[in-house]
A protein has these predicted regions:
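Catalytic NTP-binding/metal-coordinating core of nucleotidyl cyclase/transferase enzymes
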Residues: 2-76, 124
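A structural signal for short, well-ordered beta-strand segments
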Residues: 8, 58, 102-108, 181
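Conserved S/T- and glycine-rich ATP-binding loop of Class I adenylate-forming
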Residues: 12, 106, 246-248
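Alpha-helical scaffold within the catalytic cores of cyclic-nucleotide enzymes
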Residues: 32-48, 64-104, 108, 129-140
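N-terminal pre-ligand scaffold of iron-sulfur
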Residues: 199-247
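Cytosolic regulatory/linker segments at or just downstream of nucleotide-handling modules
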Residues: 111, 134, 142-199
């Protein structure tokens, strides 16, 4: 296993237990499978992965592959999820006479990533306090009467690119101090990393890893890309990249 800084998203269906009791079992499974399939597509498109399902809730992670800007991509996925659920609300109300909605919580922090399980049945798992915090941020939506909240640690990563609808001060479960959580309504600009496979320019394929203006003249910065350490150098306004000390 290894320790990574991840953007973690916890998503839960509002009042699903009483909702599921209204419907035949095959309708419940159909709704859940359709919902999970569409959520997985949105998360994958933004560079994340659903890591675990807990009943009608799920945990998604961004940054396992060491791509940058994980909080922005995670928040973008959350906003797209809410938009998709708004469409599902009408469909499920018309076809099943149920009120369908979700709550989303996002946190950014360190977590342990590794294979867990018995022999022959191991899977990639994420454990640690950050997972618990993401879950508690999601739960705080109920008290705040919101749909999407992100922790202060997550907000710091995107504060100059996020539009805040409101913020709340709450005591998260297990904490004696109040935490500030932010309700995000919109993101500005776009992610610093492309979620497409590659960018084709000047006859070559390139990976977008950061904005060029963020690297000042004379600066150096190490980044991880596809499990390789890349050294970026800006000198006389010319950009160079070094991998294993070999410039390319």
């Amino acid at each position: 296993g290894s320790t990574k800084r991840l953007a973690l998203m916890f998503v839960d269906i509002v009042a699903f237990t009483p909702l599921s009791e209204q419907l035949p079992s095959y309708d419940v499974m159909y709704i859940l499978n359709r919902y999970f399939d569409d959520m997985g597509t949105i998360i994958k498109k933004n560079g994340g992965d659903i890591n675990n399902f807990v009943g009608d809730a799920f945990l998604a992670a961004f940054g396992i592959d060491d791509k940058i800007d994980s909080v922005y991509r995670c928040t973008q996925a959350a906003l797209e999820i809410l938009k998709d659920v708004d469409v599902k609300k009408e469909v499920f109300l018309d076809n099943y006479n149920i009120n369908f909605d979700v709550r989303v919580g996002i946190h950014y922090g360190e977590a342990i990533v590794g294979m867990l399980g018995n022999a022959g049945n191991q899977r990639l798992s994420i454990i640690g306090q950050s997972v618990n915090i993401a879950s508690r941020v999601e739960t705080a939506n109920k008290e705040a009467e919101t749909r999407l909240l992100i922790s202060e640690d997550a907000f710091k990563e995107i504060e100059d690119r996020a539009e805040v609808e409101d913020f709340v001060r709450v005591k998260l479960k297990g904490s004696s101090q109040r935490s500030t959580l932010y309700e995000i309504s919109k993101l500005k600009g776009q992610s610093l990393v492309s979620t497409d496979k590659k960018i084709f320019e000047s006859g070559m394929f390139w990976d977008k890893i950061m904005l060029s203006e963020d690297l000042k003249n004379g600066d150096k910065k190490k980044v991880n890309l596809n499990e390789k350490e890349i050294l970026l150098v800006r000198n006389n306004n010319s950009l160079s990249a070094f991998s294993n000390l070999c410039p390319h």
